[in-house]
Structures are given as C-alpha cells and as structure tokens.
C-alpha cells in the first residue's frame, strides 16, 4: 500500500482566538484523496466533542423578551452574545460561571468567573454595556456535547422560569475545506493525488488535535470491519437525528433564501433533507447562490444532500 506523508504547511491564530491549519496529505492513489477528504470533513464538522454555553440566568429576568434597566442590550442580545462565547470545559459535568458588575462597565466574556475546569477562549467578546449606577448579574451554564442541541422546553430539569435556555452548538470546528491536486511521482510518470485540507477551529482545540481526533474516530468506526462475523442481528429502527428537528430559522439564511424556502413549504432541516441540489434550483426564484448558501448551512451542522436526484 502506498505510504503517504502529512505536513502542516500553515497555522494561524486570529484576533478572536480561532485557529486555522492547512495540511498536505500525499501522495495518494487515485480516488483516495476524495475518500479521505470527505470522511475527515464529515467527522470534523459533526463528530467532535466540544463545549458550549447552554443556558443563562439573569437576575430579575424571567423571559427572553425582557429589557434590563441601565443595560444597553436587551435580553435577546445578551443571550446571543453568550451563545457566541468560545469555551473549553475539561469537565463532563455542568459547569456554572457567574458575573456581577456595577456600571459603568463594558462587560466582556473574560469577566465571567468559572472554575479552573473552564477556559474562556475569546475573552474580549462583548456581553453587555452597563450604565453608571446600575447592576448586572449573570449565571452562565457550560456543558460538553457533540453537534447541535436545540432547546428542550419539555424537560422539567431545564425549564425553570428564570433559566433561559440556549440552542447549543458544541462543534469546535467552524469550517473545513479541501482540494485535490494531481501530481506525477511514481516511476513512469503515473499519476498520484495530494489532498490539501484547511480547517478552522473556534480556538477551543488546535487544528492538529482536531484532525487527529477525527482520524481516531474513523479508525474506531472501521476497525470492527476487519473482523466481520456472520451473526445475524435484528436491525434497530433508526431514531431521527436531532439536527433534523432544527427549524429553518436557525440556519441563519439570507432573507431571499429563507422566504423562497418558506413558500416551498420547507420549515425545518428535516424537510431540506428530502431535496437534492437540483431540486433546490427548481424552487421558484431560487438561484445557485441561494442553493450554495443552503448547502453550506447544512454542512455546518454535519448534514449533506446529493447533487442530483439520481445520486440520492
């Protein structure tokens, strides 16, 4: 079997502490670069465990549409700011951070006091602006998980009237792209492939660690196939994935794409999973730019749809 090398050719850390890594993998036999690229990308985008803010308690507030005296941002703005905080929790248990400030103050993520188990990655992310003579008191819940977890308002343990739930995005990977180059490296000039992979993390993990974890997950997935037995098992009824229940509004699409999908009776990710790329283009007033936007939004939550009906 052809032996290949893995080289990290670039590593950058942005102002928001997100990290970008670029890797070259090769030489590979024809077709192997696509296999590796697609498999790694799928695991990186939807299979890695991460940390996220899952709920916020604000003193004196019992619903998300309230305003807070002396605070410039309303409650919805504060919840959105908290949701966007990148955190790295080393605990498998619920971790709770607290913040108490008296204005005037520009409250940032680094002002939240957590235990030593939790690191706030992007400490300069703004949370709220408190005017002089006013107070703001927050309690922030952080948990570990995989993928996307929408708010479960039926769960009695998390439905306290003053505990404001947040749709949790545990994915530590923001973006993954790969390209494939052909190069002649063998005797006789036979063609080999080289995979170039770029991944961007939220800063809670490094690109190197993320790639290694994705590879280990794939090894664990394929290892049992090396010792296939003939034991007949009764197939279990698959449970619908949590991602399929995500409403269309949560994909943060442009107004044009959102309105076109709504008119086509598409209300959730589950509805979109029945479409191919060609189907999207047949929606009235829905062009290739809108279709690409939908594909990218679905891939952010680990879901892909076929290019055509025949490949579905």
From Swiss-Prot:
Keywords: DNA-directed RNA polymerase, Nucleotidyltransferase, Transcription, Transferase
Annotated region (Alpha N-terminal domain (alpha-NTD)), positions in chain: 1-229
Catalyzed reactions per annotation: RNA(n) + a ribonucleoside 5'-triphosphate = RNA(n+1) + diphosphate
GO biological process: DNA-templated transcription
InterPro entries found in the cross-reference section: DNA-dir_RNA_pol_insert (IPR011262), DNA-dir_RNA_pol_RpoA/D/Rpb3 (IPR011263), DNA-dir_RpoA (IPR011773), RBP11-like (IPR036603), RNAP_asu_C (IPR011260), RNApol_insert_sf (IPR036643)
TM ranges: none
GO cellular component, one term: DNA-directed RNA polymerase complex
Signal peptide from the UniProt entry: none
Enzymatic class: transferase
GO molecular function, one term: DNA binding
Renumbered residue ranges of the record's region Alpha C-terminal domain (alpha-CTD): 239-312
EC id: 2.7.7.6
Pfam family, one: RNA_pol_A_CTD
CDD domains: RNAP_alpha_NTD (cd06928)
Subunit-level organization: In cyanobacteria the RNAP catalytic core is composed of 2 alpha, 1 beta, 1 beta', 1 gamma and 1 omega subunit. When a sigma factor is associated with the core the holoenzyme is formed, which can initiate transcription.
Domain notes for this protein: The N-terminal domain is essential for RNAP assembly and basal transcription, whereas the C-terminal domain is involved in interaction with transcriptional regulators and with upstream promoter elements.
Record-stated family: Belongs to the RNA polymerase alpha chain family.
Cited function: DNA-dependent RNA polymerase catalyzes the transcription of DNA into RNA using the four ribonucleoside triphosphates as substrates.
Protein's name in the database: DNA-directed RNA polymerase subunit alpha
